[in-house]
Structures are given as structure tokens and as C-alpha cells.
Amino acid sequence: FDLLGLLKKVVSGL
């Protein structure tokens, strides 16, 4: 599970 990758995806979706 890529937590940092998921976080970046969420941030870029804002």
C-alpha cells in the first residue's frame, strides 16, 4: 500500500 502515493493523488485532486 503506497500511502504517500495515495496522499499525493488526493492532494492533486483538490
Curated annotation (Swiss-Prot):
One of its GO terms (cellular component) is membrane. Signal peptide: none annotated. The modification Leucine amide is found at L14. The keyword Zinc does not apply. Keywords: Amidation, Membrane, Secreted, Target cell membrane, Target membrane. Expressed by the venom gland. It is found in: Secreted; Target cell membrane. It comes from the Eukaryota. Its main location: secreted. Belongs to the MCD family. Mastoparan subfamily. Antimicrobial peptide with activity against Gram-negative and Gram-positive bacteria, as well as against fungi. Has potent hemolytic activity against erythrocytes. This is Eumenine mastoparan-EM3.
